[in-house]
UniProtKB/Swiss-Prot annotation:
InterPro entries: D-isomer_2_OHA_DH_cat_dom, D-isomer_DH_CS, D-isomer_DH_CS1, D-isomer_DH_NAD-bd, NAD(P)-bd_dom_sf. CDD domains: LDH_like_2. It comes from the Bacteria. Belongs to the D-isomer specific 2-hydroxyacid dehydrogenase family. The active site is at R236, E265, H297. This is 2-hydroxyacid dehydrogenase homolog. GO terms for molecular function: D-lactate dehydrogenase activity; NAD binding. It holds the Pfam family 2-Hacid_dh. Keywords: NAD, Oxidoreductase. It comes from Zymomonas mobilis subsp. mobilis (strain ATCC 31821 / ZM4 / CP4). Its EC number is 1.1.1.-. NAD(+) binds at H154, I155, T234, S235, R236, D260, H297, Q298, A299, F300.
Amino acid sequence: MRVAIFSSKNYDHHSIEKENEHYGHDLVFLNERLTKETAEKAKDAEAVCIFVNDEANAEVLEILAGLGIKLVALRCAGYNNVDLDAAKKLNIKVVRVPAYSPYSVAEYAVGMLLTLNRQISRGLKRVRENNFSLEGLIGLDVHDKTVGIIGVGHIGSVFAHIMTHGFGANVIAYKPHPDPELAKKVGFRFTSLDEVIETSDIISLHCPLTPENHHMINEETLARAKKGFYLVNTSRGGLVDTKAVIKSLKAKHLGGYAADVYEEEGPLFFENHADDIIEDDILERLIAFPNVVFTGHQAFLTKEALSNIAHSILQDISDAEAGKEMPDALV
């Protein structure tokens, strides 16, 4: 099958082409994001493969359907950028990679928490300037702290295991449909969203973005949280109202923010803007805080995850071509 792969980078080329040796699909790698302006680049393809910041809204899907596209394969777990209702009406199948490597993101979230809490980035910067002073670098033990997790799927459960068994933290968690057996196995406690917000020393987000939880971390929830708490977001930028985070940081209520995602990351992330003037004043203000650790959506980026993603999407494409059932299908 001929597949147009949007938002592709060198690491995508390597992992997907290597895995494709076992499948033999005709792959067309495109650097551009999928938008209504670039959708025509999928001409002559039968499927498109997209990533987190590609746009697959109704307008784009109509263009793709007109080109004869029958399959949209997401090389990620989240699918908030795809209009599933429109895809269904247009008879376009949509598949995702639900569990490519929960360890990659969970381990990265731990790394971000430690970098924020122990001020590792500031320490590294100091010693490179021959400054070995420790003033202002005091952190906290994660051990025995209350760690609240919002969203306990594959990634959230791995993060909970690390916090519980690796750090000896008191882990509480919220998800709409709790799994008591999982909580017992890992060693944490399910509770209400209110308790997670109000009693946690550290809150880590591990849930998909939906219309219902957009800006679930906002001015009101931040005000209810413990003074000095840390917030970690490796899920989706839209879960957090960035303006509210900035306000809470300025008021010294939020102790620190570690994020690998940003609500308006689409036109910025995965590209080199070193010589550009960034016009997003909210982002520029956010990353200026000394108690903010911010990276460009790299939590997924491990060799194992890339290999698993490549295998999953190519297998789904092969199954679609053969008319087989696809376990990871959304539509």
